[in-house]
């Protein structure tokens, strides 16, 4: 497994917090953590930080669908003409063609950005210069925003007369490819055993390109090793500690760390501390039914002291429908695809 480097090919790799390809522009710092070379599709991931008052002006992507997750600080976002005050844990769905821009309101602002379907991730190298530091520069240099154009799928939009009243963050995501903001811990919550899964973005929001979900739980056993033929999984540790097996070895992830698991890579994870929480992006999004077979609806916001039954039997029943090869499981050899071994 590659560590603290982007391998420029489809291979498993792990990045410690702050590692990646860093570009500075003005008092902004963009750290690329994944590119089309690694993802084998037009997509990119980046960590965005900046000084208080640092702004990314209104713009839109013609082809790139963007998802934002607030990691730290307070950010004001303009989304489709409406202002939102974002705080840690908020999630933003930005379909292609949606006008948006943001400003950091304190010195600790940090956003996670994933773009799928276009080359908007190239905008950071266009705007900035390679940068050795791991914190944003204290710079008053003017940024030449005019370098952004359709060649990096990022076109500036003249500021309009949008409303000043703060828009309300949602508690449940709508259906379809529409822009929206979910408040922290909100979304479609489900539970499997003692782990709570919260779907932030389902496949309807991106026309099947990806899903985004939070997972949290206490110390527990490792899930069985498995792999996918076409599915890529992107893991961001937010809290606690998780041990991941990917490819040919184990790696521990701590808050801020990232792991890329491409198709045909045997992998597994285990939560090693109580209240561990991680954010995952899964592409393509047609793997979503797996979580609906595995989980049952859940009204709570934290994992329960007495968990409900773990319904892996339902996954086994529907194995033939899923891009999933189970390499090990407790109590017997891997089941054959499409063959049920337990009753519903």
Predicted regions, residues:
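Jelly-roll (double-stranded beta-helix
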Residues: 1-28, 32-43, 55-65, 74-210, ...
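Short glycine-rich catalytic loops that host catalytic nucleophiles or stabilize transition states
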Residues: 50
